[in-house]
Amino acid sequence: QQYTGRENIYLYGAVLGFSKKFLDEKLDEIIEFSELGKFIDVPVKNYSSGMKSRLGFSVATLVEPDILILDEVLSVGDAKFRKKSEAKIMSMFDKGVTVLFVSHSLDQVKRLCNKAILLEKGKIISHGSIEEVSKVYEEKTK
């Protein structure tokens, strides 16, 4: 069976430990943030990668967890949604949430992060300030 966006909100929310009642109360907010509107009842198999990312991000950031892991979540989708998502991440920082942000976009890392780790083949090759690590990254990608 192929689940719709709406059904995936409940499935993903359950995996994250949210109750059905809580998700019922937050459903409209999730759909609104995701901007999926008329597509929310379409099977997710028909979603673009950006639409899937919007849905997952909207559920994952519904409440401020202590730690949030975002793996390339902002690498897809349109600029407007990325900007809105970056603002959401910044507001989470302001509330003390730790975000592990995985990205190949140096611009995003510079905008969102205050520390960085550079991995190569699963090994840490640089860590520290954004300035220090970005210099190593830029040298490696020349």
Predicted segments with their positions:
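ABC ATPase "signature
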Residues: 127-128
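Conserved ABC ATPase "signature" region
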Residues: 10, 22-39, 58
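H-loop/switch region of ABC-family ATPase nucleotide-binding domains
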Residues: 103-104
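A short, surface-exposed alpha-helical micro-motif characterized by mixed small hydrophobic
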Residues: 109-111
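Helical segment within the ABC ATPase nucleotide-binding domain
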Residues: 82-95
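Conserved ABC ATPase "signature" C-loop
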Residues: 121-122, 137
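A short, proline-enriched helix->beta-strand linker immediately N-terminal to the Walker B motif
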Residues: 61-70
